Amino acid sequence: NNFFLIFVFMKIIFLDIDGVLNVYCEGRDQFGCTFHSNFVDNLRNIIEQTGAKIVISSSWRSDGLKTMQEMWKFRNYPGEVIDITPFSWELMDLGLFEYYDQIDRGHEIELWLKIHPEVSNYVIIDDDNDMLDNQRANFVRTANNNHHGDHVDVLGYGLTKICSEKVIEILKN
């Protein structure tokens, strides 16, 4: 079955937005703030070099998958948004946790990966550090004061060139 073969080796980017692509409001449209053009260009480079697909793990996903896909297309952002991660309430409904404060973003990503065994490799790009220990090798944190190469990186975070190089390295291994 060719359909199955296409997705057996799928690479996924779990993408947060605020603190990754959106560090300040560069402009506005019907979807809200547009994302920083340099960070979008860095994402484009990642997609071109790895062929990875995007799963939105950001709170922006509360607008729904269809809205995220429409925004991506309307703004001509790189790559393909194929899904959003489950919400905390969905993990609660499944009986996986007793209290909301037990759930981190890493748990939401973990559940998505369990439902999608076709993923061969993944990376998590986020400015928050609430990932699971077994996800650390696949995690690139954009809130980091050690990035001095990008002139845009005045605030010390965002999807800088240095971050994007780390992402590419993870996805190519």
Q: What positions do the PLM features span?
A:
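Short, Lys/Arg-enriched N-terminal segments with co-localized hydrophobic residues
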Residues: 1-9
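Catalytic phosphate/metal-binding cores of nucleic-acid and nucleotide-processing enzymes, i.e., regions
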Residues: 10-173
